[in-house]
């Protein structure tokens, strides 16, 4: 059963002055069927849908069609007599609308409103929450923008055409509407393709991801994405389409063979191939990396210390060159932190799982349409019936409605952001620098002393209001140290303490999850024993920089990458 079968609409003829309605004198009803049978009708048939007219003063006429035009049939409604109600239809203004058409209209209106509201929530969630403003979420916002444009500018006219049974907005606007439809759908699909590539980079290079995928690169990628979508959608506007039908009440996507194949390849099959390859790679990398990290954590558990936190103080004891205050850090000794790497990788893998669900739903929604469209253009005898095609076509539209519903079900961050928006708790704070920022150079592990002390946090020392006790980090083993420096590898630097400063800063209304992450982090960044240091390292006002050092790879000659804690007094849960 199609949308056309669910509704019946007909224009009324000149309404005579009748005192008695219903089936009174002169009243009667005629019916026109889409198969070609007519009853006392002189209305022409358009798109395979003949008109029907009924005589008398109180009758109403139902005209239904079952054309094979695949996007929309343009049946011309028959004429009807004056007021009254027959077989569940009622006169509303100049139209006689059935109860089924009202139900279909209400359903489609709810469908469109859900899509608009859901995509608006995604956009506003990222705009109102600084911790959600990441490159990956920018791609998600672009996906929501494409779906929002589709829901707000295309779907209302598609729904109107389904309810009325014909296109009522003119030939010129039909061409524009079809082009915007292709533009938004192509941009949505290409956004999912971009997201899959972004997730592969995030999982494959989780520590170097901020340096690889910058905001400037993301903006260039999005500009290219919309340019490709625009090129695909401009074909019919430039004449790459079938001959224009004479009746302006017919409007549908072009079935010209060349354009159907071209648009299907560019809008679906090539992006889908990239998506499938990227997520297969994500699965392989995630499985191998998880195993190696778990094995590394087991090995590290048996070691006494690992340096994670680096605090550089002004005016501290200098190295051999006696140059205090230098920001350089070559020659500092520290171990790798597999625990931090595992934490960061697990977050990337979780985001990849969420977006894999989005991509799976996308394939289920769009594959039937992009399979049927070129097939019907190449082999007209294989065209599906109108009812089957309409279900397939609106299934593609359904993808724009379901994407915003996936995020709160699989992402607690988006769920909390949605709830805050629904409670009108959008509080945009001033822009700050990212909490973790990549240095422009690498730090090489060695046993030599540096211009600043190398401090690490003692376990259990990050208590609110308490002085922060720090102990010096031991040098790495002789096997990890450069050749010729094994003698100094076993020496420990003098202990240092850092007082009157809170590592995690003042937290406003911390959630249970945030407290758990804070507790976990305070135990992960530790070195040596829990003994408290005696000498003061610096006061809070003397802090120059706080950095997190993470090993990249043993095969890279123990080169390490440092992440700077730019604003340590405002720590967010997603920054841990």
UniProtKB/Swiss-Prot annotation:
It holds the Pfam family 7tm_1. It is a multi-pass membrane protein. Gene3D superfamilies: Rhodopsin 7-helix transmembrane proteins. Residues 21-35, 48-66 have a biased composition (Gly residues). InterPro entries: ADR_fam, ADRA1D_rcpt, GPCR_Rhodpsn, GPCR_Rhodpsn_7TM. One of its GO terms (cellular component) is plasma membrane. One of its GO terms (molecular function) is alpha1-adrenergic receptor activity. Keywords: Cell membrane, G-protein coupled receptor, Glycoprotein, Lipoprotein, Membrane, Palmitate, Receptor, Transducer, Transmembrane, Transmembrane helix. It is found in: Cell membrane. GO terms for biological process: adenylate cyclase-activating adrenergic receptor signaling pathway; cell-cell signaling; phospholipase C-activating G protein-coupled receptor signaling pathway; positive regulation of cytosolic calcium ion concentration; positive regulation of MAPK cascade; positive regulation of vasoconstriction. The chain crosses the membrane at residues 102-126, 139-164, 175-197, 219-243, 257-280, 354-378, 386-410. Palmitoylated. Palmitoylation by ZDHHC21 may increase the expression of the receptor and regulate downstream signaling. Residues 1-82 are annotated as: Disordered. Residues 127-138, 198-218, 281-353, 411-576 are cytoplasmic. A lipid is attached at residue 424 (S-palmitoyl cysteine). Glycans are attached at residues 70, 87. Disulfide bonds: none annotated. It comes from the Eukaryota. PROSITE patterns: G_PROTEIN_RECEP_F1_1 (PS00237), G_PROTEIN_RECEP_F1_2 (PS50262). Residues 1-101, 165-174, 244-256, 379-385 are extracellular. SMART domains: 7TM_GPCR_Srsx. PANTHER family: ADRENERGIC RECEPTOR-RELATED G-PROTEIN COUPLED RECEPTOR (PTHR24248), ALPHA-1D ADRENERGIC RECEPTOR (PTHR24248:SF14). Belongs to the G-protein coupled receptor 1 family. Adrenergic receptor subfamily. ADRA1D sub-subfamily. This alpha-adrenergic receptor mediates its effect through the influx of extracellular calcium. Interacts with FLNA (via filamin repeat 21); increases PKA-mediated phosphorylation of FLNA. This is Alpha-1D adrenergic receptor. It comes from Oryctolagus cuniculus (Rabbit). The lineage of its organism: Eukaryota, Metazoa, Chordata, Craniata, Vertebrata.
